[in-house]
A protein has these predicted regions:
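A beta-strand/beta-hairpin structural motif
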Residues: 28-33, 83-88, 99-100, 104-129
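Structured domain cores in non-transmembrane regions
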Residues: 40-107
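Residue-level recognition of well-ordered beta-strand positions that form the cores
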Residues: 29-33, 53-57, 85, 138-142
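N-terminal onset of structured domains
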Residues: 9-50, 59-63
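Short structured motifs
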Residues: 12-18, 38, 67, 81, ...
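Glycine-rich, aromatic-bearing surface loops/beta-hairpins
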Residues: 121-174
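N-terminal signal peptide c-region/cleavage motif recognized by signal peptidases
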Residues: 4-6
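A short, structured loop/turn motif at beta-sheet edges
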Residues: 19-26, 59-61, 87-90, 127-136
Length: 174
């Protein structure tokens, strides 16, 4: 039992994820915890850029044999990627949204990770939300190991200290 709690303490986790109706659409609010291993923290402190991925997928669950067996069809999926790195000269942590290029500065790593883990008012595609029956929105987050600098990649790919991806978690509909 001790081993399983140690393993889960070193992986990312979705603390909460709620889908809220707003106007004619729906938004997602979620909170993700990012406990980093010492190896990942050291890399960040030494200026290595780390790319975080937040993945979302909307699934239509079609019952085949009642609740015992269901066919899942992915209707929509997307990914939001952020790069986090440390600037030694300014002693700031820089968090960049790789889609919009919007960047924010933080004086502490914990502040940057807290901001990274806060998903607020993420719009969901209305074209798939006309019939909410049997719809599941899943979310997970991890580190994109393929975005690491080339010399670091092989070691990171085989080391458990870099594999921190959370399991898929279903958001709650409100």
């Amino acid at each position: 039992m001790l081993f399983s709690s140690m393993v889960s303490a070193e992986t990312f986790s979705i603390q909460s994820a709620q889908i809220i109706p707003i106007g004619n659409g729906h938004i997602l609010n979620a909170e993700i915890k990012y406990p980093l291993t010492l190896r990942v923290k050291e890399a960040i402190e030494n200026g290595v850029p780390i790319t975080f991925s937040q993945q979302f997928r909307l699934i239509k669950s079609i019952p085949i044999l009642g609740k015992y067996w269901q066919w899942n069809e992915t209707l929509w999926s997307t990914e939001i990627r952020y790069k986090l790195h440390y600037h030694a000269l300014t002693q700031q942590y820089l968090l960049v949204d790789l889609d919009t290029r919007h960047q924010r500065n933080f004086s502490s790593l914990s502040g940057a990770l807290k901001a990274l883990g806060r998903i607020e008012k993420l719009s969901l595609p209305p074209k798939y939300l006309t019939d909410l029956d049997n719809l599941i929105l899943q979310i997970r987050s991890g580190i994109d190991l393929n975005a690491l600098p080339t010399p670091m990649r092989p070691g990171a790919l085989i080391s458990s200290k870099w594999h921190l991806t959370s399991p898929w978690v279903a958001a709650k509909w409100h």
